[in-house]
Amino acid sequence: MTDKIKQQLQKTLLGHVVNDLKVVIITPISSAFKKLKLILECTEIYKNGFFDNTDFKTQNGISGLLVLIPQGVSSQDIMYAFSDTHIIFFGYAGSLCKDITIGTILEIETARLPDGQSISLEVFNSYNSVVCGYSPCLLGEIAFKYCEKAFVEKCHIVDMEICYCAYAAKVNHNKFTAMVVVSDIPNTINFWELCKYNKENFKQASNQALEYIATYIN
């Protein structure tokens, strides 16, 4: 993809063209976007494109961008707007292992795509690293089918966006790191039905993960 096409894609998705970026933080979670905006002391939010986004500078003077991406297959679109950039993903995931409980912070070392392809990710090496499988949802018959397949493939968790983004990042020669907090046990515990204890653990873990990402890039 040429620079001209990338710039046009940036204008469409972000509402502006960005240059000399070293790091891009992406998340499909609106509360995480707001939290990171405060931590990174971002000011203006660009709303002229498809994705809300805001720029920031680290304490070392490195230019970065924070982007609220959509959930689902469209999440990967942002990957095509950059090349040779470190992209850091934060999101939630469903656990397939009984010892990976609600509120566990994890790094993704491998993304297993629906076609069986495996993609290696960059890791921080600060939290446990796991294999992430693909599932388009976490409830119902479709979730059962995909989660069962992921479990057989020795995946520890499932998430849709990580798999799509990992593939697109590889195609565009981006360095991709993903950190998640476990929010669901597919077809057993739903995020919206967490008990008070699990909610508190989950909230604390989410804040800890976001603080870690902000500290890491600084």
Label for each model-derived stretch:
Residues Q76-Y80, C163-K170, V180, N207-A214:
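Predominant activation on well-ordered alpha-helical scaffold segments within soluble catalytic domains
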Residues G116-N172:
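Active-site rim beta-loop-alpha module in soluble metabolic enzymes
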Residues A168-N198:
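Zn-dependent metallopeptidase/amidohydrolase metal-coordination segment
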Residues S31, V73-D77, M160-Y164, Y197-Q208:
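Conserved active-site and cofactor/substrate-binding residues in soluble primary-metabolism enzymes
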Residues I29, G94, Y134-C137, Y164, ...:
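Glycine-rich beta-alpha junction loops
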Residues M1-N125, C155-H156, V171:
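Metabolite-binding pocket within alpha/beta catalytic cores that recognizes anionic/polar moieties
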Residues P186-N218:
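His/Asp/Glu-rich mid-to-C-terminal helical/loop segments that flank catalytic regions of hydrolases
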